[in-house]
Design a protein with these regions (language model features):
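Short, solvent-exposed coil/turn linker segments
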Residues: 45-46, 150
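Glycine/Thr-rich phosphate-binding loops of Rossmann-like dinucleotide-binding domains
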Residues: 13, 47-48, 79, 121
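Serine-esterase "nucleophile elbow" of acetyl-processing enzymes
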Residues: 1-42, 57-65, 69
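Structural motif
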Residues: 46-54
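Alpha-helical cap/lid subdomain in secreted, periplasmic
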Residues: 54-198, 202-215
Length: 215
């Protein structure tokens, strides 16, 4: 069995030179021994641009019966750029159905995932992010009888438990001079470094086991 990942920069794989940024999809195989993971997530992609660039079509030439297709977007679907933007209740949902139908056409099993949360603390409170998109994923999963990994809710709870300062270690907060890729430091509350990627990869693997999709 092979697990294919369709997604954006939060799931994507990175080179050592780009450290410490790390996507959860990059580490998923560490929590699923013996399972082949093909991480096709790519930074800057939405449900729309991933399709228009032929990335799902490429997966179609490889995916086989019994494989899994993990589908996680949103961060770039919210963009104002016309080539990326989708509406949560119309074009976003329709696009997700294309991924679901493609997997099923080849006998593979689709798995829908809500996005990981943004680390948005204000006055001691963790703010909601992503608008209606997580709900749109949940509704479609129920309508189409697709397993749902609610990473948005899982990550919100995890970040909230760690608190404002404690959750910085999950995301791309680095000191000046600590990494060549970030000579001036960084404070990014969307992308993860290894600690965050490990946590979210572990949650994903655990959910797949709970669904009985992997052993």
């Amino acid at each position: 069995m092979t697990i294919y990942i369709c997604g954006d920069s939060t799931a994507a794989s990175y080179t050592p030179e780009q450290a410490p940024i790390t996507g959860w999809g990059q580490l998923l195989s560490e929590f699923l021994p013996g399972v082949r993971v093909e991480n096709r997530a790519m930074g800057g992609r939405s449900t729309k641009s991933f399709l228009s660039e032929g990335r799902l079509q490429k997966i179609e030439t490889e995916i086989q019966e019994g494989d899994l297709l993990l589908i996680q977007f949103t961060h770039n679907d919210t963009s104002d750029l016309v080539w990326r933007h989708t509406d949560p209740w119309t074009s976003f949902s329709r696009n997700l159905e294309i991924y679901v139908d493609t997997a099923r056409l080849y006998g593979a099993k689709p798995v829908l995932m809500t996005p990981i949360c943004r680390r948005m603390w204000r006055e001691g409170k963790l703010l909601a992010s992503h608008g209606d998109y997580p709900d749109a994923v949940r509704v479609l999963a129920a309508q189409r009888n697709v397993p749902l990994i609610d990473m948005y809710e899982k990550s919100l709870q995890f970040v909230r438990e760690l608190g404002d300062e404690g959750s910085k270690k999950l995301y791309l907060h680095v000191e000046k001079g600590a990494y060549p890729a970030y000579p001036n430091g960084n404070a990014d509350d969307t992308h993860t470094q290894r600690a965050g990627a490990e946590a979210y990869a572990r949650m994903t693997a655990e959910a797949l086991r709970e669904f009985g999709l992997v052993t």
